[in-house]
Amino acid sequence: AGAFPQNANEAVIVVGKNNEISDLTLAQLGLLDEKKFVQLFRNGENGGIDPDGELPPESVVGFSQILSQKYTLFYNDVVYSRDTANYPLDDPKLSLTGKYPFVYSGGQREKGDLTAKDGEGINIKVTGILRLKDELTYGCLTSGLNLTEATINEYIQGNMKSQIVQWMKDSAKSSIDLGDLKDMDPTFADYEGVRLFFPAAANLTEKGFTQRTFGQNTVYVAISPEEAIRALGGDDTVNSVHIYAKDFDSKEALLNYLDDWNAWCTSGSGSYNGIAL
């Protein structure tokens, strides 16, 4: 239904062979309100939906409703603002007191004011609905909302130069040697030379950060600063590569090549930037 994207700011919704899509995905895309979502949950508790019967209205979303959907990708500088009042200095120790250099305000926009103005982000329109062919069991597009490569690249480029990403990339501002905290707690002396990376905003504690306790102090430790920056769209490094063979012979040749590559890497002979496939 609809049309395949012709412009960078257009997107498609991918559904299953029977036009199905998960209720969670529908809710995340704003196509299923709370009342209908709860009713679907109750239907499941009561034995589910009769596959031979008529579908209940809460489980059906019309194509016309999907094709009228619009979404907005706001740049970091629109949803993250520098908190100079509570975090006047670029001192990572302030994060130990529950303060952060940036405040997330993305959820504070009025419901009807979700259109990005020039330079604020990318406005996206759903133009088509794609369905997997019966003879296919996989494809390059995943179920749900799929953006064009041009949209993703534009969004990443816009966020790479944002204030919060630049702050995260400056290790002098976003991290501290744990040994420097020994005046606060003597146990930190045992972590001399270990750098502690702090999240730039409170909501980022859920994006690549875990909570740790050192002595009497509870701090947020990043799994890795690289992952935190990626969560902010501040890294254009390729995340994954999908290879599709044209036939079974090519598939076997490809798998043999990858096995040889991994064996070569495992033997210690080398790798491509430390990457095994």
Language model regions located:
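Basic-flanked hydrophobic alpha-helices used for secretion and membrane insertion
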Residues: 1-274
